[in-house]
Amino acid sequence: MMLLMVMTMTVNAQPKKYLGGDISMLPSYQEKGTVYRDDEGKAVELLPWLKQQGWNMIRVRLFVEPENAPQANKDEGVCQDLNYVIGLCQQIKKAGMQVMLDFHYSDTWADPAKQFTPKRWKECSPQAMTDSVYAYTRASLIALKKAGVTPELIQVGNEITNGMLWPTGKLDPSKAEGFNTLCQFLKAGCKACREVCPLSQIIIHTEKAGDWDITRNYYQQLRNRQVDYDIIGLSYYPMWHKSIPNLGQTIKNLSRLFPEKPIMIVETAAYYSHENDPWAKEDTYAEFYPISVEGQRQFTVELMEELRKHQNVTGVFWWFPEENASGSEVTKGWLNRGLFDNHTGRAMPAFYEFRW
């Protein structure tokens, strides 16, 4: 009996493993009548089917006022305002899954190359911008909570290694300068999260998994300034962030230096084609995997094998898995990194390898 109790306690102590993806474009595909299919060609209702396949968390991005985004960005899928996000989160919760909310703090894409300040905050002083981050985060979360869709995980910023809310919050992540302003913004966002959603966990998301020195310095600077968050979130794409063993070493190092912080791969994906892809250009990684259906599958196999080695890794999320141009196109051009074939709508072989 004692042995059984010890075994039960050990099992219960294991961190929950999250599996999911950022499917922020799903309502746009639904409006077009897009049909998703399993690998045998059977039509499925996507969210309930993902739940059946073992997914338990869906990531959703939120822009401040996406109507202010350039048309080119809208053509790429920038449309997720608060009302859109609430509707999608209601679908996710109805399907029995949890929500990760991804605050971009921008009217358009926020990533390493750009962290544009929302139009309404452009003339703000650093302190006024800090106050705006707090008020906006708080108001957004209150609206989600009132709609019955409190997010279980909350990202305060998206791929913010180079800072956020440029130019005010821009920084060089290899140096200490600039982190005071960034951390002022982060603390404001995290404070709002704690107040409105005290049971939710907060993620700080960076995208330099292939560069240990920058990753180490970044999270050390946050620790030095006592930023209150729970989870280290990383992007990992093989075309930009070196090999999977390199990712594994970064995870080991983070687990050693920040043992109190679980780690999640909050974005990952790999190409299966460059067909009709206006963005690909030099995004090749033939040194690791061929750009093919089999290459995408093999990447997924090896990624999951690596992540299973690390107890401190508690989640992995595919970015834009719902891409499916088999009916009507939603974006101008195909990214070809999703988990459904753009011609047939069938689940890709990689989908069935993407599991714990």
Regions found by a protein language model. Give the residues of each.
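Boundary/entry segment of secreted carbohydrate-active catalytic domains
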Residues: 14-49
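Acidic-and-aromatic substrate-binding clefts and catalytic sites of carbohydrate-active enzymes
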Residues: 29-30, 34-41, 65-69, 75-83, ...
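Hydrophobic faces of well-ordered beta-strands that scaffold small-molecule active sites
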Residues: 19-23, 58-60, 99-103, 152-156, ...
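Substrate-binding cleft and catalytic face of glycoside hydrolase catalytic domains
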Residues: 49-201, 205-209
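Glycoside hydrolase catalytic-domain groove-lining segments
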Residues: 40, 44-47, 180, 191, ...
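Structural recognition of alpha->loop->beta junctions
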Residues: 127, 134, 142-152, 222-233, ...
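Aromatic-rich peripheral "rim/lid" segments of glycoside hydrolase catalytic domains that contact
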Residues: 31, 253-260, 273-356
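Bacterial Sec-dependent N-terminal signal peptides
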Residues: 1-14
